[in-house]
Amino acid sequence: MATEDVKLIGSWASVYVMRARIALHLKSISYEFLQETYGSKSELLLKSNPVHKKMPVLIHADKPVCESNIIVHYIDEAWNSSGPSILPSHPYDRAIARFWAAYIDDQWFISVRSILTAQGDEEKKAAIAQVEERTKLLEKAFNDCSQGKPFFNGDHIGYLDIALGSFLGWWRVVELDANHKFLDETKTPSLVKWAERFCDDPAVKPIMPEITKLAEFARKLFPKRQA
């Protein structure tokens, strides 16, 4: 990996931190991972992100960059000669990738998270149905974007792969909680194969959270799930 003054403030369990880590690994950038403890904020985090006071924060040459998707953009541009391009080269393809990345964050993930916070069986059933519907849209988006290739971005992991793939660990935790498979060979065959390829990629595999550890963390984060 390339040697530079790079630090990343975050947590092993955060999907947003995962995005930054995958991008750094794709670009073969060495970095110091400064782990935050959930429920507390370090002085460095507050100093580096005084507006939102949230992780992740990438610190490159003492300059902080905040927000996960912005960090991924920055990594792709700052190290454009290292590793494959993360963002598509064509402006239209970049626009499509950004559209679906926003959909994942603003709609799809909200539905997934609502399964963990649902009050009662009926609310959970409604949340599961909504996730099913929105995941089918992502199946179609994958087929349209990939054009028969292994990833949304084509032959290698790119921006949209990172945007969705960073959620895979938590997605499996939600499947366990809901006792329901969302990635299913009969309903989303393309996404099933994509998820396997994504998790096996050398840039992802070493940092993907272990599911039992993540599930235990989720029980602490969402205590009502134990009821």
Curated annotation (Swiss-Prot):
Q: Which GO terms describe its biological process?
A: glutathione metabolic process; toxin catabolic process
Reply yes or no: does the keyword Cytoplasm apply: yes
Cellular compartments per GO CC: cytoplasm; cytosol
Query: Which superkingdom does the taxonomy of this entry point to?
Result: Eukaryota
> Care to name a GO molecular-function term for this sequence?
glutathione transferase activity
> Where does this protein reside within or beyond the cell?
Cytoplasm, Cytosol
Residue ranges occupied by any GST C-terminal domain in the UniProt entry? 90-221
Indicate the segments forming the GST N-terminal domain, all copies: 4-83
One protein family per Pfam: GST_N
Please list the residues that bind glutathione. 14-15, 40-41, 54-55, 67-68
Catalysed reactions, semicolon-separated: RX + glutathione = an S-substituted glutathione + a halide anion + H(+)
What's the main place this protein lives?
Answer: cytoplasm
Q: Which UniProt keywords apply?
A: Cytoplasm, Detoxification, Transferase
Give the EC number(s) listed in the UniProt record. Answer: 2.5.1.18
Similarity comment: Belongs to the GST superfamily. Tau family.
**What does the function comment of this entry state?**
May be involved in the conjugation of reduced glutathione to a wide number of exogenous and endogenous hydrophobic electrophiles and have a detoxification role against certain herbicides.
Protein name per the record? Glutathione S-transferase U18
Q: Which organism is it from?
A: Arabidopsis thaliana
The gene for this chain is GSTU18
